[in-house]
Amino acid sequence: MTLPFTLQQLRILKAIATEKSFTRAAEVLFVSQPSLSKQIKTLESRLNISLLNRENNIVSLTQAGKLFLEYSERILALCEESCRVLNDLKTGDRGNLIVGASQTIGTYLMPRVLALFAQNHPQINIEVHVDSTRKIAKRVLEGDIDIAVVGGNIPEEIEKNLKVEDFVNDELILIIPKSHPFALKKKKKINKDDLYHLNFITLNSNSTIRKLIDNILIQIAFEPKQFNIIMQLNSIEAIKTAVSLGLGAAFVSSSAIEKEIELKTIEIVTIEDIKITRILSIISNPECYRSKAVDLFYNELWTLKNTSN
């Protein structure tokens, strides 16, 4: 039986569905837009059904397109998996590893982990993707990422199909300017009510990390909506700089402020009788083939945790 599609056509359909644009899909796949359009027309002709809606320069999948995309993603994932299996047989402990991480982890924690892993296993090629927890989890489910460490909430419809393991606790620290009166106290400890007298700098309200911090605060009887938020920024780095310049206070991950603590550009204060933590998780797809490179990285993560305890 001759199949009415090629793997490249499946990749093109997936890219269009992801990018929602012929132009951006062509850029991602490093092909010309006319060539991409021709491939899609050929695919639709051979299948004898429309896969895409093209209205007012907006591209979306038809019902048939959505159904076919599900099978396309599974076919592509199996093809990539078969290549990894064969590569494992040929290379032994050598190979490729695709790691994912949510934003804060990917910026501050993962580089240290990967540096040690690369030192111990220089024969393994590592590719890293940093994005929101939702996007990383979706790519793990689709088989695009081998293993990931995330700190946000994973959507239930994705989480139920993943292997999710609690990894480490990440403490959320309250940082203030060194010139703030609280920083000049001998014991840098405040009570719960003091929080409502601070000027806060936060991430944008639609940020996954901001929502996570707010939810944790609500669970331990804080009312973040009553905080005096004077500034919303789009990155942890910008927030740390603003705090160091004396503009306000902020909650940040403990892993994000090691440099600032060493340089003494900010001050940490504790909240009496309260410790705010979140759980970082290791996620993988139990249905995907697990290469030797993934096993080595997985074991390295747990070794690092056990040696740091």
Swiss-Prot record:
Subcellular localization, as worded in the UniProt entry: Plastid, Chloroplast
Protein name: Probable RuBisCO transcriptional regulator
Any one Gene Ontology cellular component term annotated for this protein: chloroplast
Main location: plastid
Coiled coil: none
Keywords noted in UniProt: Chloroplast, DNA-binding, Plastid, Transcription, Transcription regulation
PANTHER family: HTH-TYPE TRANSCRIPTIONAL REGULATOR, HTH-TYPE TRANSCRIPTIONAL REGULATOR CYSL
Keyword 4Fe-4S: no
Keyword set includes DNA-binding: yes
Gene: rbcR
Listed GO MF terms: DNA-binding transcription factor activity; transcription cis-regulatory region binding
Pfam family, one: HTH_1
Known function: Trans-acting transcriptional regulator of RuBisCO genes (rbcL and rbcS) expression.
SUPFAM superfamilies: Periplasmic binding protein-like II, Winged helix' DNA-binding domain
